[in-house]
C-alpha cells in the first residue's frame, strides 16, 4: 500500500497564472500535472522546458508532455502527465486549452550538494556558511591558515566576496576586471592563477568537508575598468541614453557648486565648507534655486523653440497647394514630441494636428496672422507645462540632495564626513567625467559630440522603494534627474539591452566571467540581485549550470514583498534567500524569524507521499550577521553574540555568519575601506596576540559546538520546530525528530542591552521540559577575562580579547553550572515533565538539552510505528518489534478486515446520527465545535482530511484528542459492541490504542491519524474488491462514487424491508440479540442522509428504484438488488408500488411513478446481471394479494415475479381508482380531501399512462402546500396530472421489453385483458407499444411550426422545440412548462424521439436548465420560477411560503445524470464532432461533482442546490439517487 516515492500533484486551473507562486521540489520527486475542475473535459496540452533525460537544458525549448490515464476510463479525474525531476534549476511550464495559452508558472528544483572525499550529500538545512572579504585574506599562500579558522569553527561552506581585480575605490564589489584574479593575492616572485584557487577549493571540499561559493556581480563594473573604455556601449552613456543629458547637466552644475563651496566661495551666502546646521542647509537650498537652476535652464531640454515652430507653421499655411500628408485622429490634441537627442529647445509638435486644429477663415494675411498667434499661444502654454514639470523634478532633486548632505555631514548614525572637499564633495557624482575640467557651458558642448559623450557614463546605485522589476536607467525613469539614486560613485551601471545581440561584447564578457566562477566554485551569491535584470541573470545562471549542474544559488532580495521575491526565486531558481537576524529589534522577533524560516510544528501530522504541491516560502540562509550589516556589538552588546547565534542556528534552514562576528570584532568590517588581514589559526596563541586566534578567542569554541549541532539536527531529520518566548530576553527553541521523537531544546538568554549598563533580573522563570533530559549538549556563558581591553590593531582584524566563552559539552544535568536543580513531575499518566530551575543563566548564556520521551512512552511509540509499517514504510525508522504485544496485532489488519461484508462496512465506515440512534448510540460530539457527520471512520476522516494538509494542530478536534481518551475509546468501543468481524476490527483498534494512550498527549493527534488513515484506506480497498470490475478498474471518481453504495445501503437494528419468501435462496439471516431468533437482515437503501435514513422514512419506492441501477447494479451488488426488488414486489397493491414503504404495513400508495421505476429496475437487472432473467421466476411473498386483504406474513402466498409484473400491466389497462386508507390528517396533515383519491390508467387512443388530479401530486415533484398564511395548504405545487412525460417513457420502455421477452417466450404473456362495458377486450403488447410510439412525438413535441395541427393550445406555447412536461393536465398550461423530465424518457425509451428534435430540445435544456451541479426544475423564464428553497420561510407569498417552490426552480442533482446520458446517446446519432464535444461537456460538468464529492464532509452529492449551485441548507447532504445517476453517466462514458 505505502509507496515511498515522493509524488506531488499540481492541479491546473483555467487562466491560473502562478508566476509569483513558488513551488519547490527535490531531485528524485515526481511531479504530476492534473486537470482541475475547470479544465476537465477540455483539450489541454502541458508544455515545459524541463529537458528530456540526458538532454541539456535550453530555456527556450519547450516540449509537450504525454497524458497518462491509469484507469483508461473516460473521465479525467485521474489523468496526469508527469516529470521525473533529476536536475536542479528553475523550469517553466504552461498549458494550452485548444490553442489558447491558459496558465502556467515555474517549478524550482533544489540542487544536491556533495562534499568530502566520499562525495556525501550535504542537505541544504545543514549548511553553516561564513562570509570572508577576499581582500582581507592576504597573499594567496597565507589563505589556508586564515581559512582554517572557519574549518575549526565548524563551518561547512565559505562565501568569498569577489576574487577579481578591484577598482580604484577598493570596494570588494567594484571590479576592474571580471576575468582576472586579484593581483594583490600574488607575491612579487609568484603569480597565482584561477587554477591555484581551484586546487585550494577542491582541497577544502575533499579534505576539510567545506564547500566554497563566491559572488557574481552583474550590474556594474568599476569606473576605471579598462574594457569599459574600449566598449563604452556597455554602459549607459549620453550617446546610447540621450535621455540622461539633462541629469548630466545638473550633475556637473552640482559638482561645480561643490568645488566652490569647498573653496569657501559661498561663505558670504551662509555656506562654509563645514556644514553643521539647518540654517546652512537652507542656504544651500536658496543657492540652488537662485543661482544654479536659472543658469542651467533644464526645462529647455523638454521644450519647443516657439519662434521656429511658428515660422514653420506660417510657411505651411501659406503654401498654395499644401496637402495634409496623413489625416490626424480627431481625438489627438497638440502635444510636445520629445526630441530623442535631448537638444535644448529641440522638441517639436505634429504640424498635421496643428493645421487641423488652427484653420484660418480665409486666405488673407490677417487671418493667417490670427491663426499663428493662436498657435503661438498654445505652444507657449505647452512649454509652460513642461517648465512646471521640470520644476517638480527639481524640487525632488533638492530634497534628495539635502537629505544626502544631512546623512553624510550631520546625522548621528552617518559617516560625518567633515568639510566639503574634492575627495568628499557635497554630493556624490552621478556620471563619470574622464576629461579636464572646464566651465559649465563649455562642458555642455561635449554632450552633443558622440566621440566624447560616449565616455560620460552613469554610475550605479540603488533607489529606495523602487520597483525592482523596472530598470531605473532606462528612458521613462527620471531617477537621475530627480537625484533619487543612492549612488556608488566607483561603479558604472551596465547596459545589457534585451538580448545578447543588443550588446554582444558585454554579454560575452559576463558569460565568460560566470563560467570561470562556475568552473571553480560550487555556488554563487547573486550580488544586488533585486537590481539585476531578470533576463540577464537567467542567461548567466543557465551558463553556470551547464558547468555546475548542482549550482547552489544564494541571493539577497530587498524587494519588500514576498510576491516580488518569488518572481526572482522562481525565474532564477534561487536555492536559498539570505535572511538577516539583525532585522530583529528584540529577542521576540528573533524567535519569530526562526519559526518563520523553516520546519513544521512539533507533533505535525504525517503527510502522504502522494499529495498536492503546496506553495512554499523560499528556503532561507539565516545569517546572524551579513557583511553589509552594522556591527551587533555596537547595536546590541558583546554579550548577545552567543545567544543570538544559538537562536539562529536552531532554525530548521541553512545558517550563516560573517568573519569577525565570532572573534567579537567591535566594528563593522568595511567592504570599501578595510585593508587589514584576518587572523590566522594557532591553537596555542595567547589572547594578547592580535594576529592569531583559537578556541579561547571570542565565541569560537561555542560556535564550533553550535555549528556541529546545527548540522546534526539537519542531517538526522529534526524537522519540527517550536519557539517559546520564556520572558523578554529568554528564547527557548525546540527541534524535534518526528521519527525517533527526540528533541533538542536550546535556552538562550539574549543581551540586546549591555548587561553592564542595563538592568537584568536575577530571577529567571522556571521551565518545564516534557520528557527525560538525556544530557546537556552544551552550556556556554559569555564571560570577561583579565586581559587588556580592545585596541584596534594596525595589521590584523582583531576582536575583543577581554571577552570569551566558558563552555562545557555533553555533560549530565547534575554537572550543570547553569541549572540549579531539576525536579521530575508527571502531568498525566504518560506525561513526564522535568522542571528546570536556573541558577546561572546570566545574559549572554545558553544551555542546550537533549530530551527523549520517557522510556515507557518511547517503547509505546516504537511498537506503534512497528505496526504502522504495514500501511507505510515511512514508519520503519524508530519502529520497535516486541514479542509480547496483543496477539491480534500479529495479524495484518487487511487480513482481519477482509472478512467484512459491504453491509458491515456500512457500519464500520458510515452511519449518520439517526441511524446510530436506532442502534442506541450516536455520533461523536466535539465540545465547542460540532458533532461528526458519521459515527463510523468516515466521520473522523472527513475532519482529518481538512486539518492534515494544513497541519492545523490547534483545531478543536486535536484539542479533544490531546485532552483525553474519549474519542479514542469511542472508535474502538463502538465497534467492539457489535458482533463478528466488526468486533474483531474494534479489538484491533483497541490493541493499537492501548499503546497510543501511553505516548505524550502532544503526539496523539499525529499517531491517531496515522492509525486511522492506514485502517481507512485498507477498508476502502476491501470495499472496492467486493464490487464490480467497472469499479475495481475505475477512476478515483468512480471509486469514490461507488462508496455511496456502502454509505446508503445498510441493515439497522430493525429491518426496513418487508420479509422475503422463506423459499427464496441466499437470503441473509442473523440472530436477533434480544429474542435470540433467526431473522432476515436484508440491506435496505436509504433515500438520503441525514433526513431519510431511519425508521419509516428510510425507504421510498421511487428513490430506491431511481438509485438502484447506479448504487447496486453498476457496483455489482446483485443479490442486494434482487432482494430489494422482490421485497417491494411483495407490497404491490392496487397495481402500484408504495412510495413511503413503512415496512409495507405503513405503506402509502399515493404515487403513480414508483411502479414504473421498479419495472425499469427489473429490466435493468435482467440485462446487467449474469442469468438475470432468473429473477422473473423468483417467489414473491404477497403482503396484499387483494386490494383489501390484511397484511399477510411472508410465505403465506407466494407468486413468481412475472405474475406480479403482469398484474401491474393488467391493473393499469383496467384503470386504477381507490381512496387511500385512513384518508385524513392522520396520514397527511396537509392534503385536501379530494387529494386522497388515487387514479391511474392508460389512454385507449394513445397508449399513454395517465393519472392524478389537481389536488394530489403522484410524481417525484411532489411538494404539497403547507402554509395557511399564504393560503397554499393542501394545494400541490406541481400536480403533474394527466400523462407525465417520464412515466410515458418508463411505461414505453417496459412495454417494449415485455414484448421482446414474450416473443422469446421468456415472459408468458403477450397481451393484457380488460373488461370494458361488460366485454373482455385484449390489447397486445405489440399494439400498446405501437400506440405510444405513434403518438408520443406527435403529442409531446412542441413544434417549431406555429401552425402545427397537433397543437391543442397554441396560445400556451412559450418555447418551441421542446418536449412537454405532461400531456392532458387539468391546467393545460402546465403541459407546456420546460422541465428536465423529458430527458428521463430519452434515456429509457430513446426510440420515441427523432434525433434532430431531441438534440434541439437538449440544447434548450442545457441553456435554460443546466446548473453547476443540478438541473433547474423549472424554466427560469417561467413566472413562478424561484431558485431558492427555504422550507422554514412562512410569509404571504403563495409561490414560496413553506418551500412551495421545492420543484419550481431549485437545481436537483439526479436529473443531471439523465440529461447527460440523453446528451451522450443522441450526440452519437448527430455525428462524431457532436459526440466529441458532448464527451468534453460531460467530463467538464462531472468534474464539479467530483470536486463537491471530495470536499463534502459527508462524502456524497446533495439532493439539490439553490440556483447557480449555491448551498441549500434544507437539502439532504448526500442523496442516493444523486450519486447513482452520476455513476450511471460515468458508466455510459
Curated annotation (Swiss-Prot):
Active site located where?
527, 530, 628
**Compartments reported by the entry:** Cytoplasm
Which keywords appear in this protein's UniProt record, sorted alphabetically? Cytoplasm, Glycogen biosynthesis, Glycogen storage disease, Glycosidase, Glycosyltransferase, Hydrolase, Multifunctional enzyme, Phosphoprotein, Transferase, Ubl conjugation
PTM comment: the record says: Ubiquitinated.
Catalytically driven reaction(s): Transfers a segment of a (1->4)-alpha-D-glucan to a new position in an acceptor, which may be glucose or a (1->4)-alpha-D-glucan; Hydrolysis of (1->6)-alpha-D-glucosidic branch linkages in glycogen phosphorylase limit dextrin
The molecular function GO annotations come to: 4-alpha-glucanotransferase activity; amylo-alpha-1,6-glucosidase activity
GO BP field: glycogen biosynthetic process; glycogen catabolic process
Instruction: Give the E.C. number(s).
Output: 2.4.1.25, 3.2.1.33
The cross-references to CDD domains, in alphabetical order and at most eight, read: AmyAc_Glg_debranch_2 (cd11327)
Alphabetical list of Pfam families matching this protein = GDE_C, hDGE_amylase, hGDE_central, hGDE_N
**What do we know about how this protein assembles, alone or with others?**
Monomer. Interacts with NHLRC1/malin.
Give the protein's recorded name: Glycogen debranching enzyme
**Which species does this protein come from?**
Canis lupus familiaris
Gene assigned in the entry:
AGL
Amino acid at each position: 500500500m505505502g509507496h515511498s516515492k515522493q509524488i506531488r500533484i499540481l492541479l491546473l486551473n483555467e487562466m491560473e497564472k502562478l508566476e509569483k507562486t513558488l513551488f519547490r521540489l527535490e531531485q528524485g520527486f515526481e511531479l504530476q500535472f492534473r486537470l482541475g475542475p475547470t479544465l476537465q473535459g477540455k483539450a489541454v496540452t502541458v508544455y515545459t522546458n524541463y529537458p528530456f533525460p540526458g538532454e541539456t537544458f535550453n530555456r527556450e525549448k519547450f516540449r509537450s508532455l504525454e497524458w497518462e490515464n491509469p484507469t483508461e476510463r473516460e473521465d479525467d479525474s485521474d489523468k496526469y502527465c508527469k516529470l521525473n525531476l533529476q536536475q536542479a534549476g528553475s523550469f517553466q511550464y504552461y498549458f494550452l486549452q485548444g490553442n489558447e495559452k491558459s496558465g502556467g508558472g515555474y517549478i524550482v528544483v533544489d540542487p544536491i550538494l556533495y562534499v568530502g572525499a566520499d562525495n556525501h550529500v550535504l542537505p541544504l538545512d545543514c549548511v553553516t556558511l561564513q562570509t570572508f572579504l577576499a581582500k582581507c585574506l592576504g597573499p594567496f599562500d597565507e589563505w589556508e591558515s586564515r581559512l582554517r579558522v572557519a574549518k575549526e569553527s565548524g563551518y561547512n561552506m565559505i562565501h568569498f566576496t569577489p576574487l577579481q581585480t578591484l577598482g580604484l575605490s577598493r570596494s570588494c564589489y567594484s571590479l576592474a576586471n571580471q576575468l582576472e584574479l586579484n593581483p594583490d593575492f600574488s607575491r612579487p616572485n609568484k603569480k597565482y592563477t584561477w587554477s591555484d584557487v581551484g586546487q585550494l577549493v577542491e582541497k577544502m571540499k575533499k579534505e576539510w568537508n567545506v564547500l566554497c561559493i563566491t559572488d557574481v556581480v552583474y550590474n556594474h563594473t568599476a569606473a576605471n575598468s579598462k574594457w569599459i573604455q574600449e566598449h563604452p556601449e556597455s554602459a549607459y552613456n549620453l550617446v546610447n541614453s540621450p535621455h540622461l543629458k539633462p541629469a548630466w547637466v545638473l550633475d556637473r552644475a552640482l559638482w561645480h557648486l561643490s568645488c566652490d563651496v569647498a573653496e569657501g566661495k559661498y561663505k558670504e551666502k551662509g555656506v562654509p565648507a563645514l556644514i553643521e546646521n539647518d540654517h546652512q542647509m537652507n542656504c544651500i537650498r536658496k543657492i540652488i534655486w537662485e543661482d544654479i537652476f536659472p543658469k542651467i535652464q533644464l526645462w529647455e531640454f523638454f521644450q519647443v523653440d516657439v519662434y521656429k515652430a511658428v515660422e514653420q507653421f506660417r510657411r505651411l499655411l501659406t503654401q498654395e497647394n499644401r496637402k495634409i500628408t496623413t489625416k490626424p485622429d480627431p481625438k489627438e490634441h497638440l502635444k510636445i514630441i520629445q526630441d530623442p537627442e535631448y537638444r535644448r529647445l529641440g522638441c517639436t509638435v505634429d504640424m498635421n494636428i496643428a493645421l487641423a486644429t488652427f484653420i484660418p477663415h480665409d486666405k488673407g494675411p490677417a487671418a493667417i496672422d490670427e491663426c499663428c498667434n493662436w498657435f503661438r499661444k498654445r505652444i507657449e502654454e505647452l512649454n509652460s507645462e513642461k517648465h512646471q514639470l521640470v520644476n517638480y523634478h527639481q524640487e525632488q532633486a533638492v530634497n534628495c540632495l539635502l537629505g544626502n548632505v544631512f546623512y553624510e555631514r550631520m546625522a548621528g548614525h552617518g559617516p560625518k564626513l567633515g568639510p566639503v572637499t574634492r575627495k568628499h564633495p557635497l554630493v556624490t557624482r552621478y556620471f563619470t567625467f574622464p576629461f579636464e575640467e572646464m566651465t559649465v557651458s563649455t562642458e555642455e558642448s561635449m554632450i552633443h559630440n558622440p566621440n566624447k559623450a560616449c565616455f560620460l557614463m552613469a554610475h550605479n546605485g540603488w533607489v529606495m522603494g523602487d520597483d525592482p522589476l523596472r530598470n531605473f536607467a532606462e528612458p521613462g525613469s527620471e531617477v537621475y534627474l530627480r537625484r533619487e539614486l543612492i549612488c556608488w560613485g566607483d561603479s558604472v551601471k551596465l547596459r545589457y539591452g534585451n538580448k545578447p545581440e543588443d550588446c554582444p561584447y558585454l554579454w560575452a564578457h559576463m558569460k565568460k566571467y560566470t563560467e570561470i566562477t562556475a568552473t571553480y566554485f560550487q555556488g554563487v551569491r547573486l550580488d544586488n540581485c533585486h537590481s539585476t535584470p531578470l533576463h540577464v541573470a537567467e542567461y548567466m545562471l543557465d551558463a553556470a549550470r551547464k558547468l555546475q549542474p548542482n549550482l547552489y544559488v544564494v541571493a539577497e532580495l530587498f524587494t519588500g514583498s514576498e510576491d516580488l521575491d518569488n518572481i526572482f526565486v522562481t525565474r532564477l531558481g534561487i536555492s536559498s534567500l539570505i535572511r538577516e537576524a539583525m532585522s530583529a529589534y528584540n529577542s521576540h522577533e528573533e524567535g519569530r524569524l526562526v519559526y518563520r524560516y523553516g520546519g513544521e510544528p512539533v507533533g505535525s501530522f504525517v503527510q502522504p507521499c502522494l499529495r498536492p504541491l503546496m506553495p512554499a516560502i523560499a528556503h532561507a540562509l539565516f545569517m546572524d550577521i551579513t557583511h553589509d550589516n552594522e556591527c551587533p556589538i555596537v547595536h546590541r552588546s558583546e554579550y548577545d553574540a552567543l545567544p543570538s547565534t544559538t537562536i539562529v542556528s536552531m532554525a530548521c534552514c541553512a545558517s550563516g555568519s560573517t568573519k569577525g562576528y565570532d572573534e567579537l570584532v567591535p566594528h563593522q568590517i568595511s567592504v570599501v575601506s578595510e585593508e587589514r588581514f584576518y587572523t590566522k589559526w594557532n591553537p596555542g596563541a595567547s589572547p594578547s596576540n592580535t594576529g592569531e586566534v583559537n578556541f579561547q578567542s571570542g565565541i569560537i569554541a561555542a560556535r564550533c559546538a553550535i555549528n556541529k549541532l546545527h548540522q546534526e539536527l539537519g542531517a538526522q531529520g529534526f524537522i519540527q520546530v517550536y519557539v517559546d518566548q520564556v520572558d523578554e530576553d529568554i528564547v527557548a527553541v525546540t527541534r524535534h525528530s518526528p521519527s525517533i521523537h527526540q528533541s533538542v531544546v536550546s535556552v538562550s538568554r539574549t543581551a540586546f542591552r549591555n548587561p553592564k549598563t542595563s538592568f537584568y533580573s536575577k530571577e529567571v522563570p522556571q521551565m518545564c521540559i516534557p520528557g527525560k533530559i538525556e544530557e546537556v549538549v552544551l552550556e556556554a556563558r559569555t564571560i570577561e577575562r583579565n586581559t587588556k581591553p580592545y585596541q584596534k590593531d594596525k595589521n590584523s582584524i582583531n576582536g575583543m580579547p577581554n571577552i570569551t566563552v566558558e563552555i562545557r559539552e555533553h555533560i549530565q544535568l547534575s554537572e550543570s553550572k547553569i541549572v540549579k536543580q531539576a525536579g521530575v513531575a508527571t502531568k498525566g499518566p504518560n506525561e513526564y515533565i522535568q522542571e528546570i530551575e536556573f541558577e546561572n543563566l546570566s545574559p549572554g548564556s545558553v544551555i542546550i538539552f537533549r530530551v527523549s520521551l520517557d522510556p515507557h512512552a518511547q517503547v509505546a511509540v516504537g511498537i506503534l510505528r512497528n505496526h504502522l509499517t504495514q500501511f507505510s514504510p515511512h514508519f520503519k525508522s524508530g519502529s520497535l518489534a516486541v514479542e509480547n504485544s496483543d496477539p491480534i496485532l500479529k495479524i495484518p489488519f487487511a487480513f482481519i478486515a477482509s472478512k467484512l461484508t459491504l453491509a458491515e462496512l456500512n457500519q464500520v465506515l458510515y452511519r449518520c446520527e439517526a441511524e446510530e440512534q436506532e442502534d442506541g448510540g450516536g455520533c461523536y460530539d466535539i465540545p465547542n465545535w460540532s458533532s461528526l457527520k458519521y459515527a463510523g471512520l468516515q466521520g473522523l476522516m472527513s475532519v482529518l482530511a481538512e486539518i492534515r494538509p494544513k497541519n492545523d494542530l490547534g483545531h478543536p478536534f486535536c484539542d479533544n484528542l490531546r485532552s483525553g481518551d474519549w474519542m479514542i475509546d469511542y472508535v474502538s468501543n463502538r465497534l467492539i459492541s457489535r458482533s463478528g468481524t466488526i468486533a474483531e476490527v474494534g479489538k484491533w483498534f483497541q490493541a493499537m490504542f492501548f499503546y497510543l494512550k501511553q505516548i505524550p498527549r502532544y503526539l496523539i493527534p499525529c499517531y491517531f491519524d496515522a492509525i486511522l488513515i492506514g485502517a481507512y484506506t485498507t477498508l476502502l480497498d476491501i470495499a472496492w474488491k467486493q464490487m464490480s470490475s467497472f469499479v475495481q478498474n475505475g477512476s478515483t471518481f468512480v471509486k469514490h462514487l461507488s462508496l455511496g453504495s456502502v454509505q446508503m445501503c445498510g441493515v439497522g437494528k430493525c429491518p426496513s424491508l418487508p420479509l422475503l419468501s422463506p423459499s427464496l435462496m441466499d437470503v441473509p439471516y442473523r440472530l436477533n440479540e434480544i429474542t435470540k431468533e433467526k431473522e432476515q437482515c436484508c440491506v435496505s437503501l436509504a433515500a438520503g442522509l441525514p433526513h431519510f435514513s431511519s425508521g419509516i422514512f428510510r425507504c421510498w419506492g421511487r428513490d430506491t428504484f431511481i438509485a438502484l441501477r447506479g448504487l447496486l447494479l453498476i457496483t455489482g451488488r446483485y443479490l442486494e438488488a434482487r432482494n430489494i426488488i422482490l421485497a417491494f414486489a411483495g407490497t404491490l397493491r392496487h397495481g402500484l408500488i408504495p412510495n413511503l414503504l413503512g415496512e409495507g404495513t405503513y405503506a402509502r400508495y399515493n404515487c403513480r411513478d414508483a411502479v414504473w421505476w421498479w419495472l425499469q429496475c427489473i429490466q435493468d437487472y435482467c440485462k446487467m446481471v449474469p442469468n438475470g432473467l432468473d429473477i422473473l421466476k423468483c417467489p414473491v411473498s404477497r403482503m396484499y394479494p387483494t386490494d383489501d386483504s390484511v397484511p399477510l406474513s411472508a410465505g403465506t402466498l407466494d407468486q413468481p415475479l412475472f405474475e406480479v409484473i403482469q398484474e401491474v400491466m393488467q391493473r393499469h389497462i383496467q384503470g386504477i381508482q381507490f381512496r387511500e386508507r385512513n384518508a385524513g390528517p392522520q396520514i397527511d396533515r396537509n392534503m385536501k380531501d379530494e387529494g386522497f383519491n388515487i387514479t391511474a390508467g392508460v389512454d385507449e387512443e394513445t397508449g399513454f399512462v395517465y393519472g392524478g388530479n389537481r389536488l394530489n401530486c403522484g410524481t417525484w415533484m411532489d411538494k404539497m402546500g403547507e402554509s395557511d398564511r399564504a393560503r397554499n395548504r393542501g394545494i400541490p405545487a406541481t400536480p403533474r396530472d394527466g400523462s407525465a412525460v417520464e412515466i410515458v417513457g418508463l411505461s414505453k420502455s417496459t412495454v417494449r421489453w415485455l414484448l421482446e421477452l414474450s416473443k422469446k417466450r421468456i415472459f408468458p404473456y403477450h397481451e393484457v385483458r380488460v373488461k370494458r362495458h361488460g366485454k373482455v377486450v385484449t390489447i397486445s403488447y405489440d399494439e400498446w407499444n405501437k400506440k405510444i410510439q405513434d403518438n408520443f412525438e406527435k403529442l409531446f413535441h412542441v413544434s417549431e411550426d406555429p401552425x402545427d395541427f397537433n397543437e391543442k393550445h397554441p396560445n400556451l406555447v412559450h418555447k418551441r422545440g421542446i418536449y412537454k412536461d405532461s400531456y392532458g393536465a387539468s391546467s393545460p398550461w402546465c403541459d407546456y412548462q420546460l422541465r428536465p423530465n423529458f430527458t428521463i424518457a430519452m434515456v429509457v425509451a430513446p426510440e420515441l424521439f427523432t434525433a434532430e428534435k431531441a438534440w434541439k430540445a437538449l440544447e434548450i435544456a442545457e441553456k435554460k436548465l443546466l446548473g453547476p451541479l443540478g438541473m433547474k426544475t423549472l424554466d427560469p423564464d417561467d413566472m413562478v420560477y424561484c431558485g431558492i428553497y427555504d422550507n422554514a420561510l412562512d410569509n404571504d407569498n403563495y409561490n414560496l411560503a413553506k418551500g412551495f417552490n421545492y420543484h419550481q426552480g431549485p437545481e436537483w442533482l439526479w436529473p443531471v445524470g439523465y440529461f447527460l446520458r440523453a446528451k451522450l446517446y443522441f450526440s452519437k446519432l448527430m455525428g462524431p464532432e457532436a459526440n466529441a464535444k458532448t464527451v468534453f461537456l460531460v467530463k467538464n460538468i462531472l468534474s464539479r461533482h467530483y470536486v463537491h464529492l471530495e470536499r463534502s464532509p459527508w462524502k456524497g452529492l446533495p439532493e439539490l442546490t439553490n440556483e447557480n449551485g449555491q448551498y441549500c441548507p434544507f437539502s439532504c447532504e448526500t442523496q442516493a439517487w444523486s450519486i447513482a445517476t452520476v455513476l450511471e453517466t460515468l458508466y455510459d462514458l
